[in-house]
Amino acid sequence: MGTVEQKSTHTSPPTSPISRARSISGSIKSLFKPSSVQNSTPTVSPHESSPPLGNSDNLKKLVDTKRAELSSSRGAPPVNVNNVSNLSINTDVRPADDQPQVKSAKSPIIQTPKMAMNIVPQNIKSVLSSPRQSSSTNDRSSITSATSSVTSANDQKEKNYGSGNGSADDIPIAQLRLSEQDRAQDYTIDNALDTKDKSKPVKRNNSTSAFRGRKDKNFESSEYEIRSNSLSRIHSTPQNESPTVNNIHRGRPYSESISISSLKHIEQESKCILQVDNFKVFENGMHVHNLKIMPIVKSAQADAANDHDSNELNKQKSMFSLTSIFKSHKEDSGVDNSPLENLDNAVSLLPSIKNMAVYNRKRNISSSTAGTGGSDSDSIPDDLSERMVNPCAAIGAEELKLINTLSERINDAILCKSGKKSSHMLKEKDPDAMTFTQLYGKSMGVVLGHGAYGVVRLFSRNATERDPQYLQTYCNGQKMFFAVKELKPKSSEPKEKFSTRITSEFIIGHSLNHSEKKGGSKYSPNIIRVLDLLEISSGSFIEVLEFCPSGDLYNILTRKTKNGTALHPLEADCFMKQLLTGVQYMHSHGVAHCDLKPENILFHPNGLLKICDFGTSCVFQTAWEKNVHFQTGAVGSEPYVAPEEFIHDFNYDPRLVDCWSCGVVYCSMVLGHYLWKLAVKEKDPLYKAFYEEISSNKEFYVFEEMRHVNHEINRLRKISLYKIFQPNPDKRITIDQLLQSPWMKNTRCCIDYKTISS
């Protein structure tokens, strides 16, 4: 007969040392009552009085009778120690007559000797291991106790579950299915029971329980078959390991028996229990991403002079499009796409490398003096000497000075007559300064994408040990790669608008991902690095950005959709947590993105997520402002725009808009399509259906039908989604609250933010 698979839920009470049903707990305790019997021979405690001499014959007969009973009940040689697991028990002495017995068709009676560690017979395996086993009579073992206290009402529940009749909610969450080899070697209680959540009982709603009770064969055989057990930590005992005291796994801290937490804990590499495309999950709950790298990057390691390779590059360059930074526009047809020339004459608009240390020091001084009202005359002008109330804001005194400097230089370059150099470019260059080619390399002849103001090209150069630390971008060990974005004003656009847009976009990106600490917080790894802004000719500029070789989320979802799949729920949860963490960092620095969508989310091969494109970002709070500035008017891409943005003359909080957009992005990851095209009831029937269901039933069928490998996390996720998609922004959850929700708290992320922030 095939195995009966069951779903599992964690229901361990905080007061019980074992997470399973009370019947097993009682059985184990009765099986291993402290004993004074050793080697099946009863002994007399030294504290007991000797029997009268006159009764010696009766005593001898009694001993012989007991020996005969024990010998007949065994019927098999003693169990080898190598075939059992060890448990920690009490060491009190009790009479031999109260010895519990274990009866089985395959195993003899085991009487526990007087020792700190007792032995579990192999026939307990069927009870301690996963209940998803064959119910064959020959493979089943029974447990019989000498006392009547062993039997309880929960015994029947456990028996029903073992036969496939019990409720799934009675079983611990995250219980892994072990292979036949694992079952033969790993049946200790510590390994058979869940160890992740020891104290919190799980309470499920009716809809979730009903869903779990369905026997959906298609779902059982799907790629999500792993369920909640992918998140538990279970270490299997090696085959060559004898179950001695030193080899016992670490016990649970609330165990009522002898503590073994101080004993040696055997670390074993977790095995992969799920592999879906470029995503792996291990039995300890950890996971790894291995996203595809753009073919152009792989080909860069080969000989670039080979004609065959060059032809292949030209064919493959359109497979990925970094539309996250470089959005497609109708006006692109009027943009000059000719190759960039004379880049070695480009002049950076940023402070020189020599002055960067001074710039960083002034930033820290301005932050440290914010609480005292003090000011530094060299860093903060007189009109900005008032006390700063928000030292963590991305836009402070130094950023304001840099904005003024960049605006002046950009306007000077734009207004300069054709063929003439701006005053900034006429200045004598520092002879020690590195040229553009030395810093960022040469063009690889590949256009990554098209933007509103020009094209984006891929540049690369050989990596060296002397590379500046601030040039943090993708490196494959041989070459460093950079994305170079060209910025040219369109003939139909006012020069002031062009200057304001590129200045604000660069300043926001540059200040957000600055490597130095500001206001006690370190840079976020989920914000793309803006490395440089240079003037290359009269009215033309280039922006150098960190290169992400795995493309954007839009292309990842597009490839998945072509295969008829979507992101795995655990993978989507990890990306969602990274996205929320990056947005939280922006909000804590007074900046809202206002255009979050898959095209604006980039990836590195290891799954590191990067938020980019700050062209429409909103600075809602500077260093001198206590209150948040609200916005009016719709900003961003329609499927991801919150409903309040379409209300005429409505002042909305840009932070809550970002939260709505994050929710739409997540649903796109797990569903593979948009929820709706426009969040307006009168214009989109899909959104109208959502609004009516939420208003009348407080439910949305799309959220109710979403699946997850872990049913408890699925329930928590559903609660969070309902809080995100509140049409009324006053009732909507914030990014900070969402990151503190049970859903995100129970979401494993591949990024260790504690290490980064330390």
From Swiss-Prot:
Skewed-composition ranges (Polar residues): 22-57, 227-247
Q: Where is the composition biased (Basic and acidic residues)?
A: 58-69, 216-226
Q: Name one Pfam family in it.
A: Pkinase
For molecular function, the Gene Ontology terms on record are:
ATP binding; protein serine kinase activity; protein serine/threonine kinase activity
Catalysed conversion reaction: L-seryl-[protein] + ATP = O-phospho-L-seryl-[protein] + ADP + H(+); L-threonyl-[protein] + ATP = O-phospho-L-threonyl-[protein] + ADP + H(+)
An example GO biological process term is: intracellular monoatomic cation homeostasis
Report if keyword Nucleotide-binding is assigned: yes
What residues does the Protein kinase domain cover? 442-744
**Homology family:** Belongs to the protein kinase superfamily. CAMK Ser/Thr protein kinase family. NPR/HAL subfamily. HAL5 sub-subfamily.
Q: Which PANTHER family match?
A: SERINE/THREONINE KINASE (PTHR24343), SERINE_THREONINE-PROTEIN KINASE HAL5-RELATED (PTHR24343:SF43)
| Name the UniProt record assigns to this protein | Probable serine/threonine-protein kinase HAL5-like
Recorded source organism is: Vanderwaltozyma polyspora (strain ATCC 22028 / DSM 70294 / BCRC 21397 / CBS 2163 / NBRC 10782 / NRRL Y-8283 / UCD 57-17)
